[in-house]
């Protein structure tokens, strides 16, 4: 019975790793047609954010300029003007299609991520016993490591997260999450998050060293500061 219980966290850990990917893929396939049909039938004229509205309006201004150009070249043959009007009509249809696809993409990804978060939260609550066992395994593994390896691991992790070159990684990660939720790229917001997250993590980490490591393992703190210097 203890052996059987000891092995139960392994499939649980594997399910936590692969479950989000499987849920995302399944929900994208199942919700895509429903959201597409819902969006096309409701015929909404509301833009999801100011950036999308600005982009679409800029495209319509370009089309309007083409219409003005059409008026200016009326002395050209009728066939040439007809081709120009057909081209503008096709561009307008393509613009509307791109606009709709952008809205559908935003709604689909946002709904999928919210659903995944809700399912994983419930899954974690139901698997509380497995989480306790995983936590004990992790604590035992870390306890068996030498102080030098622990200090090296902490130093490597902090350099990756809050080191000199970390803003580039944070920018890629935040942009990826931002895009995964279906939001349009926004440089001011991303730059603000990139400049804020490392500072917050650095403060939390220093507080953790001061409150926890100094009390639990003073030798580890000495080795860490020696390697960091």
Curated annotation (Swiss-Prot):
Keywords of this entry: Antiport, Chloroplast, Hydrogen ion transport, Ion transport, Membrane, Plastid, Plastid inner membrane, Potassium, Potassium transport, Transmembrane, Transmembrane helix, Transport
InterPro entries: CemA (IPR004282)
GO cellular component terms, A-Z: chloroplast inner membrane
Any one GO BP annotation for this protein: potassium ion transport
Listed Pfam families: CemA
Reactions listed under catalytic activity: K(+)(in) + H(+)(out) = K(+)(out) + H(+)(in)
Topology of the protein relative to the lipid bilayer: Multi-pass membrane protein
Residues that span the membrane, as ranges: 7-27, 114-134, 154-174, 189-209
Any GO MF annotation of the entry: proton transmembrane transporter activity
Subcellular compartments: Plastid, Chloroplast inner membrane
Major localization listed first in the record, in broad terms: plastid
Family: Belongs to the CemA family.
Function statement: Contributes to K(+)/H(+) antiport activity by supporting proton efflux to control proton extrusion and homeostasis in chloroplasts in a light-dependent manner to modulate photosynthesis. Prevents excessive induction of non-photochemical quenching (NPQ) under continuous-light conditions. Indirectly promotes efficient inorganic carbon uptake into chloroplasts.
Name used for this protein in its record: Potassium/proton antiporter CemA
Species, as recorded: Platanus occidentalis (Sycamore)
């Amino acid at each position: 019975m203890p052996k059987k219980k000891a092995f139960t966290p392994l499939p649980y850990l594997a399910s936590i790793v692969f479950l989000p990917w499987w849920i995302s893929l399944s929900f994208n396939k199942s919700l895509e047609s429903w959201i597409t049909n819902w969006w096309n039938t409701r015929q909404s004229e509301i833009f999801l954010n100011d950036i999308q509205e600005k982009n679409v309006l800029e495209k319509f201004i370009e089309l309007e300029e083409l219409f003005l150009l059409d008026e200016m070249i009326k002395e050209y043959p009728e066939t040439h003007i007809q081709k120009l009007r057909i081209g503008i009509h096709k561009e307008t249809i393509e613009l509307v299609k791109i606009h709709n696809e952008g809205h559908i993409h935003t709604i689909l990804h946002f709904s999928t991520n919210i659903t995944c978060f809700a399912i994983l939260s419930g899954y974690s609550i139901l698997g509380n016993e497995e989480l306790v066992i995983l936590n004990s395994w992790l604590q035992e593994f870390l306890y068996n490591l030498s102080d030098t390896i622990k200090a090296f691991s902490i130093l490597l992790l902090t350099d990756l997260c809050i080191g000199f070159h970390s803003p580039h990684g944070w920018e890629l990660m935040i942009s990826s999450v931002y895009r995964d939720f279906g939001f349009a790229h926004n440089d001011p917001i991303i730059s603000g998050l990139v400049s804020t997250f490392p500072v917050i993590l650095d403060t939390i980490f220093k507080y953790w060293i001061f409150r926890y490591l100094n009390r639990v393992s003073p030798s580890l703190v000495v080795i860490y500061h020696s390697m960091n210097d």
